Amino acid sequence: MISGMQRHITFRDGQQVCPLGQGTYQMGRRRNEEIKALRRGVDLGLTLIDTAEMYGTEDLVGEAVRDCREQAFIVSKVLPSNASYEGTKRACERSLMRLGTDYIDLYLLH
C-alpha cells in the first residue's frame, strides 16, 4: 500500500471497505486468468470490485466472488439510458442475475 494511505474506509454502519478497488472495464478476453486475479485481489484485501452493465463483466465478477461474496464489496452501475425509476429497477435486477447474488453493495449511475 501507499505510505500514509488509509487501509479502510469505515461507513456509518461500521462496514469497512478498502479505498483501492479492482476495475473490470475491458475484462473478459482472458476470463479464467481474470477470475483468478480478482479472487487473488480479494484474498489480499482488495475487496472493492467495480463493474457495470456496460462493461459486460458482471457475470465474470459473480463467478470470481462466488465463494467469498461476504468479503467482496461490489460496485455496479446503471446506464444512463436505463436511468428512469422503472428502468433502474429492471437494470438492477438484471445485474443481480448476472452477478449471481441477491445484493449489490453500491449501485451508481454511470
Sequence positions of predicted segments:
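N-terminal binding-site loop/beta-alpha segment at the start of enzyme catalytic domains
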Residues: 1-72, 102
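Glycine/proline-rich, positively charged
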Residues: 26, 39, 43, 66, ...
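Generic beta-sheet signal
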Residues: 75-77
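A short acidic, glycine/proline-enriched capping/turn motif at secondary-structure boundaries
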Residues: 79-83
